[in-house]
Amino acid sequence: MESQGYAFARTARVAALAGALLLMAAGLAAQPSVQKIIDYIDTNYEVRSDMTAQARITTKDPDQGTKVIESVYYRRDRDDAFLIVIAEPETDRGNGYLRVGDNMWMYRRNTRTFTHIGRDEKIGGSNASAGDIETRKFKELYKPSVDSSGREILSEETLGGAKIPVYRLEVVAKVNDVKFPKLVMWVTRDKYLELKRESYSLSGTLLETSYFTNYKEVEGRYVPLLWKFVDEVEKGRTSLFEIIGIAFEKVEDYMFDKKYLETLSK
């Protein structure tokens, strides 16, 4: 009887262990890969039509105070061209940023000159850059980061006081023309919306922390209407990028031309 009882207990322990392993395996199988999460993010951010948006950038600097920039953003879908026209403050009115093809320019009204710029050019002196406005696909720019054993760096966490269920993942650049070579991202587990991002240098120094909130569903896609950029190098410096109004209507081709920006200055 004792041997039978021992055998029964051992069988029960083995069954319990097997069940736990099966549950763990099921959980691992249900967890998407980092690449799959990146694909979901690309799908969410994908815009399939021309777009016009009113945007406000509020930059707070401990030395220079607060600056508010009002602008209008135009995007042409067929070639991903975009135009940003500054409306306020008065000192910057008529300045702009134009991207057509692989070329990007900054226009200054007071000198009526165009300067060829890179994706890391800051818009109006804020922490938001020209590259942040582009709609380049994540999968074309970044790849999953792996640990010493070759496994993707991916975990399940909760974020913020609301304890939002998120995936925490790490990616590294696979092209050279990106603003940051390494990113750590927090993405919701249900709709794959990016809520937080930490941006690092090659040496592993944290350079910027970004937050994406106030998502709005538009034509089956989700657009963050509020972006916050926290400068981790210049402490106390932050930029808030707000989309005030957004419309998906055709934008005329003549607007994506240097001549159009010049006419606004007359």
Provide a role label for each language-model segment.
Residues 2-17:
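Bacterial N-terminal signal peptides that target proteins for export
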Residues 15-26:
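Bacterial N-terminal signal peptides
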Residues 113-117, 130-133, 156-258:
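Gly/Pro-enriched, hydrophobic low-complexity segments
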